[in-house]
């Protein structure tokens, strides 16, 4: 596994109070071609935590319209990361 690729996999945190506070689950926007083992290694390496499980889903981009011009938002991939008990990520601080 290439170290550079691990740091490029996580694009942005998808912050929601419901996910983090109630279930200890964190949501990230990831590269569309990222696999579950790659996402797990990337989170463990960047945040120094133990990952229990990873679930992913592909989100289809919405069609948009500005007056008569029609467009489309990009498709993206979302990863739900469940941490082991006792592990926590402070997303606001970055690490």
From Swiss-Prot:
InterPro entries membership: Nucleotide-bd_a/b_plait_sf, Ribosomal_uL23-like, Ribosomal_uL23/eL15/eS24_sf
Keyword terms: Ribonucleoprotein, Ribosomal protein, RNA-binding, rRNA-binding
GO molecular function: rRNA binding; structural constituent of ribosome
Keyword Transferase: no
Cellular component GO terms, alphabetical: ribonucleoprotein complex; ribosome
Top-level division of the source organism's lineage: Bacteria
PANTHER family named among the record's database cross-references: 60S RIBOSOMAL PROTEIN L23A
Subunit structure, interactors included: Part of the 50S ribosomal subunit. Contacts protein L29, and trigger factor when it is bound to the ribosome.
Protein name as it appears in the record: Large ribosomal subunit protein uL23
Species assigned in the record: Coxiella burnetii (strain Dugway 5J108-111)
């Amino acid at each position: 596994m290439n170290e550079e690729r691990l740091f490029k996999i996580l694009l942005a945190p998808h912050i929601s109070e419901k996910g983090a506070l109630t279930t200890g689950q964190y949501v990230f926007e990831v590269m569309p071609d990222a696999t579950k083992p790659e996402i797990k290694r990337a989170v463990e390496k960047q945040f120094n935590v133990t990952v229990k499980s990873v679930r992913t889903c592909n989100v289809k981009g919405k069609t948009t319209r500005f007056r008569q011009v029609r467009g489309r938002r990009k498709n993206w991939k979302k990863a739900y990361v469940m941490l082991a008990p006792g592990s926590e990520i402070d997303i606001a601080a970055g690490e």
